[in-house]
Amino acid sequence: MNKNFFDAIKERRSIYAISKESPISDEKSVKIVEEVVKHVPSAFNSQTTRTVILLGESHNKLWDITMEALRKVVPEKDFSSTEEKINSFKAGHGTVLFFEDFAVVESLQKQFELYKDNFPVWALQTSGMMQFSVWTAFATEGIGASLQHYTELIDEQVKREFNIPNNWKMISQMPFGKIVKAAGEKTFNPIEDMVKVLR
């Protein structure tokens, strides 16, 4: 991972066409996630983020669960496109699940009442940095990934299936794998509408 930081940010894209292969070993993928979790900042050094890396049959099971959950809420006449989308995630090599440990958040709320309304917000900010960092680190290794949010539909069943503590709040799912098709051209709003410089 010796690329320029800004090159890495530019390279990170939502990649939906991925395969079961991976350009790097599972051990290296796990190490990337471990290093990010260890070093991404968190308010009060609270280290609230939790991750679960699903590979092989565990990865397949996640997307089977998601498919069946969606089947219950998406009209049958509209389901083919949903099925195609979920199968594209299942076609990947693995999935990283991102959680925040709200037992830690609630403990901090009790310790520091002045900031109690902020801790859930800060936890989500940490999670956002975590997701972006894993995603970008994967991109530098030639791994394609995207960020998905099926949490409300699958949270309870995923926790049962993979024995995940109830106090872990699921935030997102990141399927990843070898890139089959690159992302299309990205468009940008005028930078002057988004960045103000005052002197």
Specify the residue positions occupied by each region the protein language model found:
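C-terminal helix-cap and adjacent tail motif
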Residues: 5-11, 16-17, 170-199
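Short acidic/glycine-rich loop or secondary-structure boundary segments that cap or lie
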Residues: 61-63, 104-108
